[in-house]
Amino acid sequence: MIISTTTAIEGRPVQGYLGVVTGEAILGANVFADFFAKIRDIVGGRSAAYERELRKARQIAMDEMTREARELGADGVIGVDIDYETIAVPEGGSMLMVSVSGTAVKLS
């Protein structure tokens, strides 16, 4: 499965567009609590633990999008967009949602 942020794959013309595919993953409020509890992990303004959780969430979302594309019979996803949203929760905290979307395609 070829995944690309571009709208075309060089040398592989699109034979058919199969539809929009998406994937989402949410980092729960406990991740933020753990993040701030482990503030000592921050080196140079970065937190390895938090970045690891973000990578994990992004991979879950990408895997979900890829699975959806395979179910449509696609062999590629083009125009992939990755977004990060903060979602407020009633208890006053927040969660982070990672969402990905793209167009499932059949390539030649």
From Swiss-Prot:
Parts forming coiled coils: none
Domain of life: Bacteria
InterPro entries: UPF0145_dom_sf (IPR035439), UPF0145_YbjQ-like (IPR002765)
Family as reported in the entry's similarity comment: Belongs to the UPF0145 family.
NCBIfam families hit by this protein: PRK02877.1
The protein, known as: UPF0145 protein gll1048
Organism lineage string: Bacteria, Bacillati, Cyanobacteriota, Cyanophyceae, Gloeobacterales
